[in-house]
Amino acid sequence: MEAALAIATLVLVLVLCLAGVTAVSMQVRCIDAAREAARLAARGDVRSATDVARSIAPRAALVQVHRDGEFVVATVTAHSNLLPTLDIAARAISVAEPGSTAARPPCLPSRWSRCCCASPVRVHI
């Protein structure tokens, strides 16, 4: 009886450790994706920014790129399958370069918003 309880506890601890390592890995990927998206969008290349963020971010991540004054803000949010109550997100901010077209990102319609250049660009990966 005690051995069964010990084995079940050990398995639970191992699953939680695996979930923690997976969450940290997803966080690093979200940070990298947000950083690259903000950097590219600040140069005025919003489409490349979302494409690069898609390739770096975890699967099924939500990528948002929008202008906030003189800054370009990129946010990447992913959902952990092993920790269902945990959403992992990262945000990167970059100053828009002078003369860039980052002031008005091109419309990229998605399932969350209608195509409107005044709203943030939201891309579901």
Curated annotation (Swiss-Prot):
It is found in: Secreted; Host cytoplasm. Induction: Component of the Rv3654c-Rv3660c operon that is highly up-regulated during M.tuberculosis infection of macrophages. Transmembrane segments: none annotated. It comes from the Bacteria. This is Apoptosis inhibitor Rv3655c. Keywords: Host cytoplasm, Secreted, Signal, Virulence. GO terms for cellular component: cytosol; extracellular region; host cell cytoplasm. One of its GO terms (biological process) is symbiont-mediated suppression of host apoptosis. The lineage of its organism: Bacteria, Bacillati, Actinomycetota, Actinomycetes, Mycobacteriales. The keyword Secreted applies. Effector protein that participates in the suppression of macrophage apoptosis by blocking the extrinsic pathway. Interferes with caspase-8 activation and binds to the host E3 ubiquitin-protein ligase RNF213, whose fusion partners have anti-apoptotic function. It comes from Mycobacterium tuberculosis (strain ATCC 25618 / H37Rv).
